[in-house]
Amino acid sequence: YREPLAKARSTVAESYKFIESDLDSAILYAPDMPMSNYTPTHAQAGKTTAQALKAKVLLSKGDYVNAALLADEVIQTAGNYGYGLVDFMSIFSDMFDSPEVLFAPYVSNYEEQCSFILDRTTYSSYSQKIADAMDPTPGNKETGEGYDPRFAAPFLTPDVITTSFKNGKYPHSTNDDGKSNTYYFLRLGEVYYIHAEAEARQGGNHLAAARTSLQTVLDAHVPGVYDVSTIPDNQLLEMIRQHKWIDLLFENQEEWYDMIRYYKHGDLDITTIRPNIKSDK
């Protein structure tokens, strides 16, 4: 018998190496499109999802050159496997069958249902602040007028059971199972934001590619509303973050990790958003 010994905590570099190795194996061996009963499924992860996840890891790591290259590869090849950007709210009515969903795991027991946990979530004051800044017109929370549709639609969807309003990204009864339990872990739209940020952080002639990706995802989700060519170069990174925040609101909590990354780069004073943060350790 030997007493258990505490193992030293892995370094950040070791952790990244392990995660990247795992994702490299998935990229090498995972199917191009996962199948369930001979039907393509987005509830399982395939090669494209692994590539997108690695691009996300590289962005967090600060390897912007390779994050941009890999995100662009996903964008360029996604259509070969049935993935693509779609109308924003159709993502959430089609759930994990949506072409935009790269990976959306689900559970089947009532107690564990994502819809039960998330369907009553609402926006924060900071989320509303971002939405207000995007459209100077006074917003009406009853009709959604004056708000970006990506912000308004989630809380303006009637409950199919009670006719009261609930979170429109989870527009189904909490008693449902199967597809109604979709948890939006990763969408193709997020890959466009990853690519946009990774290019923008390289500056110079990379800004054009950043604008192209940002404009493409905005045209798909809120057509005719935004013209990214009017964004000054020194505000582009922040606008990418804000659009990504509104787009992914109520989904995978990515906005928190974005705030940390922007803070560490000196792009954002995180204490103006969360004053109770006392340390970056």
Stretches found by the model and what they are:
Residues C114-I117, Q128-K129, P136-K141, T230-K281:
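Long, intrinsically disordered, low-complexity segments
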Residues L102-A104, E190-Y193, M239, L249:
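Structural recognition of the beta-strand scaffold that forms the well-ordered cores
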Residues Y1-G189, R201-A209, D233-Q235:
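Structured, solvent-exposed acidic/aromatic patches
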